[in-house]
UniProtKB/Swiss-Prot annotation:
Keywords: Acetylation, ATP-binding, Cytoplasm, Helicase, Hydrolase, Isopeptide bond, mRNA processing, mRNA splicing, mRNA transport, Nonsense-mediated mRNA decay, Nucleotide-binding, Nucleus, Phosphoprotein, RNA-binding, rRNA processing, Spliceosome, Translation regulation, Transport, Ubl conjugation. It comes from the Eukaryota. It is an enzyme of class 3 (hydrolase). GO terms for biological process: embryonic cranial skeleton morphogenesis; mRNA export from nucleus; mRNA splicing, via spliceosome; nuclear-transcribed mRNA catabolic process, nonsense-mediated decay; positive regulation of mRNA splicing, via spliceosome; positive regulation of transcription by RNA polymerase II; regulation of alternative mRNA splicing, via spliceosome; regulation of nuclear-transcribed mRNA catabolic process, nonsense-mediated decay. The gene is Eif4a3. This is Eukaryotic initiation factor 4A-III. The modification Phosphoserine is found at S10, S12. Residues 69-239 form the Helicase ATP-binding domain. ATP binds at K60, Q65, G85, T86, G87, K88, T89, A90, D342, R367, S368, G369, R370, Y371. ATP-dependent RNA helicase. Involved in pre-mRNA splicing as component of the spliceosome. Core component of the splicing-dependent multiprotein exon junction complex (EJC) deposited at splice junctions on mRNAs. The EJC is a dynamic structure consisting of core proteins and several peripheral nuclear and cytoplasmic associated factors that join the complex only transiently either during EJC assembly or during subsequent mRNA metabolism. CDD domains: DEADc_EIF4AIII_DDX48, SF2_C_DEAD.
Length: 411
């Protein structure tokens, strides 16, 4: 097991990495030498899966995808220390889809996640990437009808993504048969342990065939996780992904000086035609501000959708579905959107409010240029926000220039 490497980087190293255009030069740590595969075409993936990857909007694999997908496909047990925003979900999703025998209508891969939302998101991602493969994939989560789970599992599912409690329940009821499972993925393993799922994870593992390949993704590697990897894994390869250096790459960042809060709205209206060139997300710091801005934009006859954490899950899902499909083009949101949700078409982010802490900045704008896409981020900055903007610049060793008149040409 490789020693737990430090996540910190010096200011000068951070600066060097941020300016680095070539993702293969991102500082990476692995427990052994790992080949870098710079394109999806050179990974040896099946043709119908490649079609799904490109149709989904991915163009170039992210740094973790360039390193981990080949290792997982080869059958290696893999520990990926990585946070959301690095492309981790697509890393294991592509690998899982590559390893399936579609002719066999039995569960061949099991993915455990800490929350229902994440499990559903993983399931939807698998169905989208596997669109040309005729893949069956079910989300097995608490809070839903048990009978429906049993019916779906009886029908036959190639992949099951779910929360540990419900998955174990389905295994115990013999509705989820484990004999054909080849791969177990533990996503956000540290979060699962924080939520008290340790027992259920071990219970699930005991029912899997002895030769099951294990892929574990975790932002941190505390003692309990390392204990789990020792029990579940054989000679795992460990890949550490440092996120902050990756995600400002290829993103042009600008600010617009607004003297007072009231002027932000007029500035946004002036920019609306630019927003709808592709798709845009507008971030506000509070739910109340999201509701207020949405109403004000609609009163001015602009088409926008909005989302925040107080909305019922069903409503959030349908808003995300509309946005993903391109039916809605401008989404106003709080930071609930900024973590782990992939919409490849988003190429413009507007910070109507600068984030309350500088770590959130990368969560927000890092998504606008992911997977080799370029992006633009525009920050609305009041006079008393200048200090915060400078702090963000310094923290990320980046440069945020005044927005040029021709910003539409850059998107």
């Amino acid at each position: 097991m490789a020693a737990n490497a430090t996540m910190a980087t010096s200011g000068s190293a951070r600066k060097r990495l941020l300016k680095e255009e070539d993702m293969t030069k991102v500082e990476f740590e692995t427990s052994e030498e790992v080949d870098v595969t710079p394109t999806f075409d050179t990974m040896g993936l099946r043709e119908d899966l490649l079609r799904g990857i490109y149709a989904y909007g991915f163009e170039k694999p992210s740094a973790i995808q360039q390193r981990a997908i080949k290792q997982i496909i080869k059958g290696r047990d893999v520990i990926a220390q990585s946070q959301s925003g690095t492309g981790k979900t697509a890393t294991f999703s592509v690998s899982v889809l590559q390893c399936l025998d579609i002719q066999v209508r039995e569960t061949q891969a099991l993915i455990l996640a800490p929350t229902r939302e994440l499990a559903v998101q993983i399931q939807k991602g698998l169905l989208a990437l596997g669109d040309y493969m005729n893949v069956q994939c079910h989300a097995c989560i608490g809070g839903t009808n048990v009978g429906e789970d049993i019916r779906k599992l009886d029908y036959g599912q190639h992949v099951v993504a779910g929360t540990p409690g419900r998955v174990f329940d389905m295994i115990r009821r013999r509705s989820l048969r484990t004999r054909a499972i080849k791969m177990l993925v533990l996503d956000e393993a540290d979060e699962m342990l924080n939520k008290g799922f340790k027992e259920q994870i071990y219970d699930v593992y005991r029912y899997l065939p002895p030769a099951t390949q294990v892929v574990l993704i975790s932002a941190t590697l505390p003692h309990e996780i390392l204990e789990m990897t020792n029990k579940f894994m054989t000679d795992p390869i460990r890949i550490l992904v440092k996120r902050d250096e990756l995600t400002l790459e290829g993103i042009k960042q600008f600010f617009v000086a607004v003297e007072r809060e009231e002027w932000k709205f007029d500035t946004l209206c002036d920019l609306y035609d630019t927003l709808t060139i592709t798709q845009a997300v507008i971030f506000c710091n509070t739910k109340r501000k999201v509701d207020w801005l949405t109403e004000k934009m609609r009163e001015a006859n602009f088409t926008v959708s909005s989302m925040h954490g107080d909305m019922p899950q069903k409503e959030r899902e349908s808003i995300m579905k509309e946005f993903r499909s391109g039916a809605s083009r401008v989404l106003i949101s709080t930071d609930v959107w900024a973590r782990g949700l992939d919409v490849p078409q988003v190429s413009l982010i507007i910070n109507y409010d600068l984030p309350n802490n500088r770590e959130l900045y990368i969560h927000r704008i890092g998504r606008s240029g992911r997977y080799g896409r370029k992006g633009v981020a525009i920050n609305f900055v009041k006079n008393d926000d200048i200090r915060i903007l400078r702090d963000i610049e310094q923290y990320y060793s980046t440069q945020i220039d005044e927005m040029p008149m021709n910003v539409a040409d850059l998107i």
